[in-house]
Amino acid sequence: MKLMRVRKGVVARAAERWARYRGERRLAALMLLMVFVGGPLAAAQENINEQVRALREKLLLDAYRPGYHFVTLEGRCGPFDPNGAIFWKGRYHLFYIFQDHRGHNWGHASSIDLVHWRHHPTGLVSGMFSGNCFINKDGVPTMCYHQTKQGNAMAVALDDNLDTWKKLESNPITPKTSEGDPHHGKYRSWDPYGWLEGNTYYAIFGGKRPAIVKSESLEGPWKYVGDLMAHTVGDVDINEDVSCADLFKFGDKYMLLCISHRLGCRYYLGQWKNEQFYPEFHEKMSWVDNDYFAPESLLDDKGRRIMWAWIFDGRKKKTRNESGWSGTMGLPRVLWLADDGTLRMSLPEELKVLRYNPKTMNNVTVKADSELTLKDIRGNSIELSIEMVPDGAQQFGVKVCASPDGQEETLVYYDANDKKLKIDTNKSSLGEGPKSVEAGPFELKGGEALKLRVFVDKSVVEVFANERQAVMRRIYPTREDSVGVVLFSKGGSVKVPVLKAWDMMPSNPY
């Protein structure tokens, strides 16, 4: 009987996991009924196995499921905000929002190399929305998160694998206020970010007119300090929405990574002093829409500041649901502050382990107003490293995922006319998906070569230029032959001293 109870428990957990796979609780209930009302145990187990295999096979064959970008294993993740990122005991830990019948939960994965990820049991469930992880006074990882309807909250880790957490009995740390409360209207209990400074805990409470609260103890009492922002900067209003906040020391400055639901992913550079943030500079990290969203970062043992963001699936909701999954993150970006006080960004060296089948071209010239198809370089899971020196060219770059007749193609290029790095997806697909031009401000200085790193991963194109700018788009080509790579130049010629290409090994299990 004991063995039977154990096996029933295994099937019960498998059934619940399948409910997450498909979002179909009725199927899980049917499987449980087969077990507990006398149905054959072996048949129920085999039925589950077959369904799981079928889903895995479906995901393996999905033409738009990225191979080396971090993706959800299965099911609906919208939003798919990265949360609680922390480097702990030699491992990178990344939490993320997913949805099931309980509502919003935090999934969890860890890695030692930022490439291969082990998925952990779901330990933070029901009512978990955006938040972060920091080390408390006792040296224990602590989550500060939005507890949906209840307000902002805290939880502490109970093991070094960060699998088990205890939510504070004093949660929420600061309740939502109502009419008549002395602090009503001064802050919103939303998208918190917590940290320890000296002997004091601080937290940003996000939303419009974001606030600072503080306490000497995690359990409180928490006190309202005042506005996060000391003043405005540029044309950004002091009341601009600050959500998914991430504040940290950055060189001789502080960086505030965040989003607003109007401006998308963005950042401030400035100073943290007198319990306020004094912004000096503001820039966006997405421009045409909010498809690059909800940034989250950590500091690792090498001193690297590494960030992730959710990249949105732009297909119709019905299409996303039928695919059996939805949730992709951008490649991890290493951020640092240059000597001139501006942001620099690149990729972790660890990603190079995915490269294979290297190809190199040297001293190529693309004539004015012409194209050059690279016959030996093609694919939809590749990395390109291209150095381009313009000679009068006004628009020059590379087309990826291009069909032979040009019906489908995605353009990656520098536009000297408006000094921007662009991805044009207007011809990326004959089917659905956003048609737009993403354009990030970027200027080549006199005589400077354009140094592109282009990552194509099925439905994702990410581009890095001269370690100063990055842009991203989702694409959904419909043709099997939309795998071409084409150099192009307009308004003048361009020289390509060196072009390197690699196929990229998938790191996701399916």
Task: Give the ranges of each region predicted by the language model.
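Surface loop/turn signatures of beta-propeller and other carbohydrate-active proteins
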Residues: 46-84, 115-135, 162-196, 221-246, ...
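Bacterial N-terminal signal peptides
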Residues: 28-39
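Conserved Ser/Thr-centered positions that define the repeating blades of beta-propeller domains
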Residues: 111, 155-159, 212-216, 270
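Bacterial N-terminal signal peptides that target proteins for export
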Residues: 4-29
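Hydrophobic core segments of beta-strands in well-ordered, beta-rich domains
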Residues: 80-99, 120-122, 130-156, 173, ...
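Boundary at the C-terminal end of the N-terminal hydrophobic targeting segment
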Residues: 42-44
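Beta-rich accessory regions
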Residues: 52-56, 272-277, 282, 286-290, ...
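Repetitive beta-architecture junctions, highlighting loop-to-beta-strand starts
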Residues: 104-106, 150-153, 208-210, 220, ...
